[in-house]
Amino acid sequence: MRVADFSFDLPDELIARYPTAQRNASRLLTLDGPTGALADKQFTDLFEMINPGDLMVFNNTRVIPARLFGQKATGGKLEILVERMLDDKRILAHVRSSKSPKVDTLINLDGEHQMKMIARHDALFELELLSELTILEVLEQVGHMPLPPYIDRPDEDADKERYQTVYNKTPGAVAAPTAGLHFDDAMLSALKHKGVNIAFVTLHVGAGTFQPVRVDNVLEHKMHSEWADVPQDVVDLIAQTKAAGNRVIAVGTTSVRSLESAAKACGDKPLATFSGDTDIFIYPGYEFKVVDAMVTNFHLPESTLIMLISAFTGVDEVRYAYQHAIAQKYRFFSYGDAMFLTKKAQ
């Protein structure tokens, strides 16, 4: 299986660089897995597609202002993108600089805060904050929202709200779980009132989600690792939902990966809680254990995420759906439109 099999040409003007005026004002392309049928909808139409008794699983991670700007004592400027908070003082980060910082290099941040480079781990740098404040407090003071590279503009004040789900709770992500950006409080309340069950997992999306696949053979790709948590209440709700013959609907590929990671860890045993790092890589041929349907945005060409949805609804079906979306001028990527996918028979 070749990475090039998941390529497509996207006109630059279809990349959404700003969100819609209202969260739920996006368009929605539905793809029925069993038949391959497509339908053009509005995101608000999703309400009619979710049945009482269905379980919707959301990722409640909170995006941290993970981009920092600073300079070394020599005056050399650098940009830091947090990959993961190790504790209250230490981070793993990507560092962009004309020269990579060496161990013990001091970095002066905006706002008079200082960090020290204490170790290097392959492409990532371990940095320690030299302050009485915590990393999270400093990020909230001087950090910038880590907009994806393809948005290609500086972050603005509005991004602090719009590049964040309304139900965010646990800080740690450096990219938004973007399928969730379409939901507002009113829609969530309406779904609950309809009898739809709502549950939350956590997966702290890392910057690796934007890293290109650098091999030709899909099977040779090594996934980045991210921290995920699937608590007991979610496990119980999934069991109840399945027993009643209803659907588990994941909102976003991060929710999919969280649930399927829990299932993978259990092997042939019943689903149980999961908390820890996951590097699950889902590509065509994978058999889904938990998820019956999903809400997702449109993904980058040759990305692991387009491979995931192709595993869910079929390679040819996804290719045709994306061709249709481009022809109909859907908006792509993080601030773009959404899809509702049901699983192809396995």
From Swiss-Prot:
Whether Cytoplasm counts among this entry's keywords is yes
Q: In which pathway does it act?
A: tRNA modification; tRNA-queuosine biosynthesis
The UniProt keywords, alphabetically, are: Cytoplasm, Queuosine biosynthesis, S-adenosyl-L-methionine, Transferase
Q: Which GO terms describe its molecular function?
A: S-adenosylmethionine:tRNA ribosyltransferase-isomerase activity
Q: Where in the cell is it found?
A: Cytoplasm
Question: Might you give the EC number(s) for this enzyme?
Answer: 2.4.99.17
**GO biological process entries:** queuosine biosynthetic process; tRNA wobble guanine modification
Q: Which GO terms describe its cellular component?
A: cytoplasm
Q: Which reaction does it catalyse?
A: 7-aminomethyl-7-carbaguanosine(34) in tRNA + S-adenosyl-L-methionine = epoxyqueuosine(34) in tRNA + adenine + L-methionine + 2 H(+)
- Main location (coarse class): cytoplasm
Top-rank taxon, per record: Bacteria
Function recorded in the entry:
Transfers and isomerizes the ribose moiety from AdoMet to the 7-aminomethyl group of 7-deazaguanine (preQ1-tRNA) to give epoxyqueuosine (oQ-tRNA).
The record's subunit annotation is: Monomer.
The entry's family comment says: Belongs to the QueA family.
Q: From the Swiss-Prot or TrEMBL record, give the protein name.
A: S-adenosylmethionine:tRNA ribosyltransferase-isomerase
